[in-house]
Amino acid sequence: MFRATAIIRADKVIDAVPAGHAVLERDERHLRRKAIVLEGGEKVLVDFAEPIVLEHGDRLVLDDGREIEIRAASEELYEIRGRDPLHIAELTWHIGNRHLAAQIESDRIFILRDHVIKAMLEGLGATVTDVTAIFSPLRGAYSGGHSHDDHDHHHGHHEHDHEHHHHHHD
């Protein structure tokens, strides 16, 4: 089994022809150490130091230098539309308040299907439609800024040449 320890983000890909493809749903694209199956049946061990979210078009770099392209699988979603931008903002707030993953666009929101949430959104006046599409939700504010872009694995620390002032309150 080949091993992948580096990633090239989709917007940094130079080589147009990957050695293979893996089609993964949104939950499967959030990983740290996991074996994934390529379209041809070959297995690859993804082995990162920290959890990462793979996006459609990203490439995994194998230990032999080959690249595997990640393709987002189509998933069963709800497309949510509001009456106007303010209504969409209100609907987005209710979705976020329930800690649901959401793909937010200027005139609509996508979430994974859940009949209870659908009823709530319709009760709030939303138009909710069943769709099948690639799901690329926003990453949370606390998802971390660390990435493995451009094969960067440096985890060093830098020196501080300034003082740290700590204020303690009793």
Swiss-Prot record:
Bias (Basic and acidic residues): 146-162
Biological process GO terms, please? protein folding; protein-containing complex assembly; urea metabolic process
Report the locations given in the UniProt record.
Cytoplasm
Q: Where is this region: Disordered?
A: 144-170
The family database entries (SMART domains) matched by this protein are listed as:
UreE_N (SM00988)
MF annotations from Gene Ontology: nickel cation binding; unfolded protein binding
Q: Which NCBIfam families match?
A: PRK13261.2-6 (NF009760)
- Protein name in UniProt: Urease accessory protein UreE
Species for this entry: Brucella anthropi (strain ATCC 49188 / DSM 6882 / CCUG 24695 / JCM 21032 / LMG 3331 / NBRC 15819 / NCTC 12168 / Alc 37)
